[in-house]
Amino acid sequence: MIKKFLSSKESKYVTISLDDNFKKNSVDDKFWTYCKGCDSHVFRKDIEENSFVCPKCSRHYGLRARKRINLLIDKGTFMEFNSDVEFQNPLNFPKYKEKVDSYKEKTKESEAVVTGYGRINGIKTVICVMNPDFMMGSMGSIVGEKITYSIEYAAENNLPIIICSASGGARMQEGMVSLMQMAKTSQALSKLEEKSLPYISVLTDPTTGGVTASFAMLGDIIISEPNTLIGFAGPRVIEQTINQKLPEGFQTSEFLLEKGFIDMIVDRRKMKEVLYQILAMHKK
C-alpha cells in the first residue's frame, strides 16, 4: 500500500487556499499591518515613520488626536486646555455614562476632541483635533463647548485657529442638545471674522453629519487629506431618498475639490508645511 502510494504519479500534496480574512489577520499585528489600499502587508514601523501613510500606495491611516498634534505642532509647544471636563448627560440617556467611561479607558482621553494652542514652525496658533476613536468623534455638548471655547480664545488673543475634523456627526445620546452645538460653534466663528483672523479647516476621514453641516465647512480655507469621506448623510440614505444613483466617487475629497466645495487636498506628510505657509501669509 505504502509502496503503491510512493510510486503514484498523482500529486502527494494538497494546495490549501487561504481565505482573505485569514491572510489579512494571520500576521502578528505588532510588526505588520494589512493595507486595504494596496492589498498587501506592510511593516508597521514603516507606516509610523511615514506619518501613518502607507509607503507603498500612500493610503492615509486614521489617527488619534494626539498623534496628529505631534505631526503638526512643534515639539514641546502644545498647551492643552479644558482637558478635565466633567461628563454631562443632559437627557439622562440610559447607559450613556458607561459607554463614555469605556471610551475614556480605551483612548485615555476625556472626550472626542483635544484642544489647546501651540506653534507651527514658530507661529502660534490655536488647534482643535477630533478623535475618531472616541465614539466616532461624535459631537455632544462637551465637544461643542471645547471647540467654542477654543474659537473664543483665538478671537480674544488675536490668534488663528486650525480645526481638524474627524467625526460621525452629532451624538445621538444627547439628542437636540447635540444639534444645538452646530449653531453654537458656527456662531462663535463669526467672532473670528469680525477680527479678520484666519480659520483653517482640515477635513480628515471621515467628516460627516452635523460636523460637516457646521464648523467643518465654514473655514476661510478648507483643506482635506486624500480620499477622505466628506458628507452629511450616507450615500445609501441619499439614494433611497432621491431615488437616483449617485455619481462615482460621490462624497470623496477629490469629488468635492472638483466641484469647488474645498480649496485643496494635501498629503499628510506635507500638511504641516502647507499650514505654516498659510499662517505665515496671514500673520499680523
From Swiss-Prot:
Q: Which GO terms describe its cellular component?
A: acetyl-CoA carboxylase complex
Annotated disulfide bonds: none
Question: What broad class describes the main subcellular location of this protein?
Answer: cytoplasm
- Entry cofactors: Zn(2+)
Q: Zinc finger (C4-type) locations?
A: 35-57
What family does this belong to?
Answer: Belongs to the AccD/PCCB family.
Source organism (scientific name): Clostridioides difficile (strain 630)
- Domain spans labelled CoA carboxyltransferase N-terminal: 31-284
Alphabetized HAMAP family for the sequence: AcetylCoA_CT_beta
Q: Where in the cell is it found?
A: Cytoplasm
Q: List the top taxonomic levels of the source.
A: Bacteria, Bacillati, Bacillota, Clostridia, Peptostreptococcales
Q: What chemistry does it catalyse, as a reaction equation?
A: N(6)-carboxybiotinyl-L-lysyl-[protein] + acetyl-CoA = N(6)-biotinyl-L-lysyl-[protein] + malonyl-CoA
Quaternary data: Acetyl-CoA carboxylase is a heterohexamer composed of biotin carboxyl carrier protein (AccB), biotin carboxylase (AccC) and two subunits each of ACCase subunit alpha (AccA) and ACCase subunit beta (AccD).
Q: What is this protein called?
A: Acetyl-coenzyme A carboxylase carboxyl transferase subunit beta
The EC number of this protein is: 2.1.3.15
| Enzyme's top EC category | transferase
Q: In which pathway does it act?
A: Lipid metabolism; malonyl-CoA biosynthesis; malonyl-CoA from acetyl-CoA: step 1/1
State the Gene Ontology BP annotations: fatty acid biosynthetic process; malonyl-CoA biosynthetic process
Q: Which gene encodes it?
A: accD
Gene3D superfamilies with a match to the protein in the record: 2-enoyl-CoA Hydratase, Chain A, domain 1
Entry function: Component of the acetyl coenzyme A carboxylase (ACC) complex. Biotin carboxylase (BC) catalyzes the carboxylation of biotin on its carrier protein (BCCP) and then the CO(2) group is transferred by the transcarboxylase to acetyl-CoA to form malonyl-CoA.
